[in-house]
Amino acid sequence: MDERAQRKRHTLLGYGACALAGTLWGTGFYFGRIALDEMSVEAMVLYRFLFACIGMLPVLIRHRARLTPSETRTLLLAAALGVPIQFLLQFHGLVLTTVSHASLMVGAMPVLLAAAAAVFAGERLDWVGWLALCGSTVGAAMVVLGGTRVTTGNETPSLAGDLLVIASLITALGWILLSKKLMQTHSPRVVTAYTIYSGMAMLAILLFGMQLLAPLFHFSAPEIPFTQVSARAWAALAISGLLCTATTTLLWNWGINQVPASRAGVFLNIEPALGSILGVELLGEKLGPYAWLGGALILAAAITLTMRDQETQPAVILE
């Protein structure tokens, strides 16, 4: 296999990995909502990453990284942004707003990623790429708003919840770009494993530290239930950790190591689209013609970016 054919193969596999990651991420809100019926946001995120650490343990044992002091600081910053900060902001926002609102804002992520990659990582996207990204985002908006939804209880959107979700997207941008920088000198699986374990350690220190300090400073710390958690919630947490976190992060990091992050970002729109489709069962939504048209826009954007004969400049392939 010549160099050009091998590069094309890596590019297609990279897009496939990003697409699969976006698909699995799309189930995250569904399984997260199941767990949130029985525990706090903090407990749900903690257990989710505990299962993710279990899934990444073989990688951590088999692959040791030698990081420079500068790389260590970058890794810790990426872990802080990508684990405790992003997930606590996102799911606290989900509690305060509706799934449709949260999914709609996540649909803006590809354009934000493309802009950030152009500014901070020196990546370039031509007008067709920008058009595809914008079309994909419009498609995601049509999917999440293209169904009728009966609001019950306290399920109403709020500015505070929307702003928390937006803040989580900004932190996710930092995690993606910092991870891509680390993967210039380290393999994606090493970066993924060390990021998840470092982020889990930060999350555990934060939550258990709050438990210890709560009696001293007289504030209410989030409870971490265990024995009273149902088998259904444990199954949702295990799937969230093993598939929606460990597997997706590994796939995404490997994928953006093969293709520019600005172009791979279109596959992030699978998340809100699939999340909205799962909402049919979870929230009683009905998908109308606009939703189906939105799905077609997302698919067309993905095909446009992946099938165009354009040379990409991926990061150094280490595997």
Predicted regions: what is each one?
Residues 1-20, 65, 108-171, 290, ...:
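Juxtamembrane helix-loop boundary signature in multi-pass membrane transporters
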Residues 23-29, 57-106, 116, 142, ...:
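Specific transmembrane alpha-helical segments of multi-pass solute transporters/efflux pumps
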Residues 22, 33, 45-49, 71, ...:
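Residue-level recognition of transmembrane alpha-helices
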Residues 31, 89, 112-116, 178, ...:
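Hydrophobic side-chain positions within alpha-helical transmembrane segments
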Residues 43-54, 82, 87, 91-133, ...:
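Specific alpha-helical transmembrane segments that line the substrate/conduction pathway
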Residues 24-39, 51, 87-97, 105, ...:
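Juxtamembrane C-cap of transmembrane helices in multi-pass membrane transport proteins
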Residues 13-17, 43-58, 77, 130-141, ...:
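Hydrophobic alpha-helical transmembrane segments of multi-pass integral membrane proteins
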Residues 27, 31-34, 38, 52-68, ...:
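Membrane-interface helix-cap regions at the ends of transmembrane helices
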